[in-house]
């Protein structure tokens, strides 16, 4: 982005936020997924503060065909490509729900179709999952469990989407000594950041012995790179005493995920969207099974109108 073919366009005709493009991820079809403030919207709880939302976009590698592919309201972050070609990312979702608890994982096809809950959209603990990375040779992913009002540090977790899409069973704590910030407690020693899986049980990550910094507090400058395992081991790999170290990333080839052809019809902007619901009675909002088949007579569909920045 920012090349001669990028007009730095702001969607909706508004020019109230500086354009910021973050978190790029290479797509199997040659494009790049990233999050951007070009949507010119912001979360409703920010009360006039300059905190524009970053939503999922994509662009071709030559800078052409830059477009928004997710139309949420609050921030999205950390897109990564799954082994099946879909994109997994963090989405802050608070339509008709608590404003701070649901920053969880969604997935979408690279063209923006098929957006769905990947894990946690009806899960209250942890409050947020971020920095998701697929585990090599596995269908599982590793992520960072953190809070709403915190620097992006916390507990390393592993998620198995084949077990389920919500609640505790699909989630394994790799570093259980680190609490879920805000959801369980606010203080405690040590925290992790930027985990990168080598296997299902071995990870590179940044670690600090200092507590998780809350909103408005400066994180400690003592993060170093460690090798972490699922049995509680932590071995120092590299430390710089003058600055924190983050984002350890192995430089090696990996299998390319399949290219998912676009499912968008021609002139899609002029057509109604389609919502697929397989069985309304299979949901997380009736744990006791009190709703009987035949009771539901209608569905309510909300249209999300973004709040201008």
Predicted feature residues:
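Short, conserved, GDST-rich strand-edge loop motifs in beta-rich repeat architectures
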Residues: 1, 10-11, 34-52, 89-103, ...
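Surface-exposed loop and turn segments in beta-propeller and other repeat-based domains
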Residues: 1-15, 67, 115-125, 164-186, ...
